[in-house]
């Protein structure tokens, strides 16, 4: 009976993979929207609503905690429902929460309820992420995160345009039309919720139910956690792998959201005073395009020459372009062309450099139980980004943008330290 069920799952997975181009782009597009909301959109909304940068970035960083708990959520979700329904339930929930966030923004006392819904959105997004990982792994016959990388990268980068570029443009225009900031960003949240619900309906039609078996027995999650950690720590280069995961993106955690707020903050606060419409063009359109080009080029380079060959160039690419923000902070340039070019170069370098992290994460996820190892490795990386993001707003408020970005260049040494100690012998010639 169990063998018959396994054969049925394989048949349905093969049928789903035959038309994967009908669901992979939209699924990864929707997967990227919550990340963009956490990293960029909600910080902008809170900034426009008058919340200080320190409180803003601290609260937004807490939304990454569900992604740190991803391994436990993955274990727990296997007892709730199959990955097909998990994806659909999470998408409907995310859409409804965005609609509720839009309603809450119209209230006089809005911040506590808004943050509660925001954290609920992050939790639903983490479950959605788990469901996508399981569904993709089954359909691609366990070649976990090795298929259609260009399609997934393009869809994820398109999420920046859909969840940052377009909403920021709409929000800025509505601010001008209505002269009411809460009304403008309330409408943005409601429109984004509607888009998510439409994509959920589309996925309900195109995604093939796999009929996977649920885990019916009650698990001892504490015992399972220790067992998973034992398997993780038994790896030959465990310490060096964890060092890389924690440190490589640490400077980016300190930079990204502060960089966005620097662009929109008024000159009296040391910012560049871009309007939401200008931010939508620079960060949400030109920046997203630069990141997409960087990701595609980085993936191609690693495919041709391997991880070790491109590790140091990619480390330089993800750190050195931050110097443009140092220059802009000290000059307070008003040239929109120079600002846009600087954002493009920084995002291109980020897209190119992060492919080293993606490649290493893909390598660590190979072998026995790839979803489990991917979840734990992703959680470790999320810890570094969460801690750095929580501190970034406090430090930026205290030091000012000029000193903060200058110190950030020194903090980039963490990425070089991670690259120096990574053990590349076992993954030489790694292909994406």
Predicted feature descriptions by range:
Residues 92-109, 316-334:
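C-terminal ends and interior cores of transmembrane alpha-helices
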Residues 194-213, 418-422:
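C-terminal membrane-cytosol helix-exit motif in multi-pass small-molecule transporters
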Residues 79-93, 303-317, 336:
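Cytoplasmic membrane-interface "Motif A"-like loop-to-helix N-cap segments
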Residues 2-18, 211-241:
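Juxtamembrane intracellular "pre-TM" segments in multi-pass secondary transporters
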Residues 68-82, 293-310, 396-397:
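Helix-to-loop junctions at the C-terminal end of transmembrane segments
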Residues 147-172, 378-389:
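Glycine-rich segments within core transmembrane alpha-helices of 12-TM secondary carriers
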Residues 367-398:
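A late C-terminal transmembrane helix in Major Facilitator Superfamily
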